[in-house]
């Protein structure tokens, strides 16, 4: 069997969820949208269900997958609904729903439901993606209450730059949110992963840890609380070929690496079809036979090459960690000019193995 696999440590997942609770004292929705950022939504939900206050996904399709797997905990639809016809399913399956636009509010008002909804009313506090304008927020809240279709409302917004700890934007968003919710008697939710780790002043009865659940930092610089996270995924494979090259020889497509010295080259069963970033350049760190080395040459669809010159003990069959506990996903993402969110979500072909259940 091809050795490219993702090892998912569910005990580390639980540790990171508990850390979100510990740091905030709030209730926490575990964000498991996009198949739990490539970690497997159902398995992650089952691992957390005994202690999680609820889950958050992008859309009703993701929520129904959890319900089909027997997950009974609250599930929030972060994008809300896309058509009014979804409201009956939302009520039937006891899902919670974000309302971020007036058309959604109007759809709720005119739809007959057999049970009232739990709505998370989203404010655009400055990100300008989705969310109600502050001038419409109070009226929307009152209309939801008056509709007779809503049993509970949670007030929410989303940070745009909370991963930048020295930026003024987050404090400004907090101020906009605080002003908009004045006089509204409801719980609130502001803090995502960087909010949990770096913005203790942000009000939140509910927090929404996403990336931090999987043990990756949302920050580009070191941050004390993020250092306590435990990586959940280890992307691993093995060396499948070794060759010796003299100085001056090219490696891989486009000859993007030319050996500056006699070089021992290892080929690893891992490529961009597995989700490893094709744009990862020469020098991207990897771990082989327990020692750090680096990527050389362009990443191929199914294979990549690494420098084994200074790892003489590595040979065919030696284990390789592409990211995990020793080579952080954030390191690989930074070298590739992207973010850990993306490299996790890009994993499609790699089978997953679970430990710590």
UniProtKB/Swiss-Prot annotation:
What reaction does this enzyme carry out catalytically? L-alanine = D-alanine
The Gene Ontology CC terms held by the record are: cytosol
The record places the active site at: 33, 253
SS bond list: none
Q: GO molecular function, one example?
A: pyridoxal phosphate binding
Q: Which InterPro entries match?
A: Ala_racemase, Ala_racemase/Decarboxylase_C, Ala_racemase_C, Ala_racemase_N, Ala_racemase_pyridoxalP-BS, PLP-binding_barrel
Per UniProt, the keywords (alphabetical) are: Isomerase, Pyridoxal phosphate
Cofactor(s) listed in the protein's UniProt record = pyridoxal 5'-phosphate
Signal sequence segment = none
Where substrate binds, per the record, is at 129, 301
Q: How does it assemble?
A: Homodimer.
Of which family is this protein a member?
Belongs to the alanine racemase family.
- Recorded protein name is Alanine racemase
Could you read off the lineage of the organism from its UniProt record?
A: Bacteria, Pseudomonadati, Pseudomonadota, Gammaproteobacteria, Pseudomonadales
Gene name linked to the record? alr
């Amino acid at each position: 069997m091809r050795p490219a696999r993702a090892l998912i440590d569910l005990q580390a997942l639980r540790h990171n969820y508990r850390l979100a609770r510990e740091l905030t004292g709030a209730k926490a929705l575990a964000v498991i949208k996009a198949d739990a950022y490539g970690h497997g939504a159902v398995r992650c939900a089952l691992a957390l269900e005994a202690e999680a206050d609820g889950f958050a996904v992008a859309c009703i399709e993701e929520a129904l997958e959890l319900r089909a797997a027997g997950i009974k905990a609250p599930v929030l639809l972060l994008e809300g609904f896309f058509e009014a016809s979804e409201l009956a399913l939302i009520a039937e399956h006891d899902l919670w729903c974000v309302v971020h636009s007036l058309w959604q509010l109007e759809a709720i008002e005119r739809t007959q439901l057999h049970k009232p909804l739990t709505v998370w009313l989203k404010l655009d506090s400055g990100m300008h993606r989705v969310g109600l304008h502050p001038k419409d927020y109070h009226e929307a809240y009152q209309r939801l209450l008056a509709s007779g279709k809503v049993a509970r409302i949670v007030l929410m917004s989303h940070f745009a730059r909370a991963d930048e700890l020295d930026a003024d934007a987050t404090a400004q968003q907090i101020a906009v949110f605080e002003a908009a919710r004045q006089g509204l008697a409801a719980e609130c939710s502001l803090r995502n992963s960087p909010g949990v780790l770096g913005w203790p002043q942000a009000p939140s009865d509910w927090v929404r840890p996403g990336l931090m659940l999987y043990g990756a930092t949302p920050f580009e610089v070191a941050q004390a609380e993020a250092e306590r996270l435990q990586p959940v995924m280890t992307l691993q494979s093995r060396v499948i070929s070794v060759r010796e090259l003299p100085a001056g020889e090219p490696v891989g497509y486009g000859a993007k690496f030319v050996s500056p010295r006699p070089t021992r080259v290892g080929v690893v069963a891992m490529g961009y079809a597995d989700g490893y970033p094709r744009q990862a350049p020469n020098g991207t760190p990897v771990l082989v036979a327990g020692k750090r080395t680096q990527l050389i040459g362009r990443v191929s669809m199914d294979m990549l090459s690494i420098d084994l010159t200074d790892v003489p003990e590595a040979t065919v069959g030696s284990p390789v960690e592409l990211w995990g506990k020793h080579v952080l996903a954030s390191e690989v993402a930074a070298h590739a000019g992207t973010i850990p969110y993306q490299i996790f979500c890009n994993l499609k072909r790699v089978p997953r193995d679970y430990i710590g259940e």
